[in-house]
Amino acid sequence: MPLTADQVAALKASWPEVSAGDGGGQLGLELFTKYFHENPQMMFIFGYSGRTDALKHNAKLQNHGKVIIDQIGKAVAEMDNAKQMAGTLHALGVRHKGFGDIRADFFPALGMCLLDAMEEKVPGLNRTLWAAAYREISDALVAGLES
């Protein structure tokens, strides 16, 4: 079910706090370190190896995390135009086809780690709302991945 105009407005209003500081770079890094800690088998698929705590100093992972959070920010900015947002994310999913064995079943766990990292950064975050937003974002991306 699509997000309502009020929900989109609430997401947009909370985004500056979510991405505050370094534009979300640290948030993206926390997302991936949580994800790899809970799903160590995924490190290889994403092109990483070693201990998950050592990854906090990996420049490539830091950049990847920032790129992910930037893309979420773009999706939030486009959420009041669902067709535009879906098109942008669909194209992103298509580009990810060339990055190896990325499958739709990776996204729920990644989303949980994202929500955990967001909630740690922003206590009182509306997790239910952000979970719904993540579903819309990941569904559009997966549609491109599977096209």
UniProtKB/Swiss-Prot annotation:
Gene3D superfamilies listed in its UniProt record: Globins (1.10.490.10)
Domain Globin, chain residue ranges per copy: 2-146
Keyword entries, A-Z: Heme, Iron, Metal-binding, Oxygen transport, Transport
SUPFAM superfamilies the record matches: Globin-like (SSF46458)
Pfam families: Globin
Single GO MF annotation: oxygen carrier activity
InterPro entries noted in UniProt: Globin, Globin-like_OT, Globin-like_sf, Globin/Proto, Mb-like_M
Recorded superkingdom: Eukaryota
Binding site for heme b: 96
Complexes and interactors: Polymer.
Note: This protein is one of at least six components in the polymeric fraction of Glycera hemoglobin.
Family note: Belongs to the globin family.
Name listed for the protein in its UniProt record: Globin, polymeric component P2
Lineage, top ranks: Eukaryota, Metazoa, Spiralia, Lophotrochozoa, Annelida
